[in-house]
Amino acid sequence: MGNVAIVFVTLMFSFFPLYLSDRYYYIRHDKLYAFYVLASLLVIAMGNVFLIHYNKKDKENKIENKKNKFSFTDYGIIGFFISAIISTLISDYKFDSLTGALGRNNGLILIFAYFVIYFIISRTYRENKVVPIVMAVTSSIVAFIGILQQFYWDPLNLYNGMSSSQYTKFISTIGNRNIFSAYLTIVMPLCMVLFILSKKYYQKIIYGISAVITFGGIVCCNSDGSILGTIGLFLFCYIFFIRNLKDFSNLLIITSLMLIVCKVIRYFSYIMDDYSMGFSAIESTLVYGNTYVVIGITLVLGIFLNIFSEEKGITKTPKVITLSLIFLTILLFALGVFAFCYFTFIDTKTSLTGAMKYFRFNDSWGTHRGFMWIRGIYIFLNVNIIQKLFGTGCDTFGQIMTDMGYNDELMAFKNETTNAAHNIYLNYLVTVGIFGALSYITFVVSSVIRGIKRSMRNKYCIVLVASVISYSIQGIVNIDQPITTPLFIVIVALLENQNRIKA
């Protein structure tokens, strides 16, 4: 059974991100149907293997058997699936809730597919050294295509037949830029942490190159979600890896290399006479800003600590450094919260520019995500008690926005409408209710907590934890859909698989 799961996971991280049939015209449905086919083949193959070997004991199986209790992560996805069923049954748009046709196809059928593959992968997958390398190589290809397209180089001719005004909306073999950013927040953390933990030089080279290229893709995709997820990732990694001097030195080195690739992009832009699709505020600072001092400090300090830890045999970082970094992180977070509250509730008149705009929440915040979030809360407050508990129907947020007149308001405000909240958690709060949203959060948070605990005995668990954290944070400003969510479910399933291994 383990071999079947390995093949499925390998295809999900190689074939799936690269597959598209007709450029960007049907890309969401291409990925949707590809996932359905792969999931169906997994179920069929697993069923055949079970029928053949059901009476044979797998002596190599170290995974807890079915007599063991479900984990909190299991209960989370079970509750989420149950809420999706109830939501569909009580919805005014039952068929659309089933298919997700009113939104991004994240309907009950797709949620059922998530549910099935999660339990298959979490129970049958066996660790394989080839899978992460395949993931790293594929993600590098996907990200590199995106970097080239940022400068109007289109190696796969994906923009053929599109107007130039649409170029800025789509990128690489993933599609929409926000979805591309979500993909990168899954794979970049995997490559980055694998670089930190790998002992063999060839693995460090592969994962290091992949981490750098995928970070370059994040810089070029111009999406708030990927920047938010990356900030959360780095905060987590610096706090987690500070305890081990060797790991911390590797983190400093990969940080410097990621900053260096921003300068490589800068010089490439110079060669191209700055003929690009442009960079947002934070990305522009990374590319064009004077970050050479930071690069030098992180690189030199990382190399010094790496050599020092090997020569002196010191593995633990001095406690004063650990506590100082944690204190600095808390201080910066507190200052950020203070600035956000001050410019949102007290000083609402001062003009804010660049990245400072994120510290004032209003209808225009985050490409008018503020408008959608505020109306999303209004929707939740106005539906009946049953809908508060179980939602209005899977992926029906946009239709409810229309029914309550909020899409008309959005059209008057920004000359467009929306079919999603652009916040995974708020979207689920409306569509599958309190029960579904809390179940989903339980599914994610419990996997992270258990993964961190498990990493004390198996450091490689933190590779998957980093990916889950990064994607979950970017989800605050993004949406679930059939392009990246299946990959995220696979990551959580792999983490659950590791969490269930007996000590």
Go through each PLM region and give its residues.
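Interfacial juxtamembrane loops and adjacent helix segments
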Residues: 149-174, 349-367, 374, 383-430
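Short, hydrophobic transmembrane alpha-helix segments
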Residues: 19-32
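Transmembrane alpha-helix boundary signature
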Residues: 47-67, 87-99, 154
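Non-cytosolic membrane-interface motifs at loop->transmembrane helix junctions
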Residues: 31, 98-107
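Membrane-interfacial, low-structure loops and terminal tails that flank and connect transmembrane helices
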Residues: 55-70, 277-280, 308-324
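Membrane-interface helix caps and helix-loop-helix hairpins in membrane proteins
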Residues: 96-101, 219-224, 475-481
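Alpha-helical transmembrane segments of multi-pass inner-membrane proteins
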Residues: 4-22, 37-50, 78-91, 107-120, ...
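Membrane-interfacial loop-to-helix junctions in multi-pass inner-membrane proteins
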Residues: 64-74, 126-136
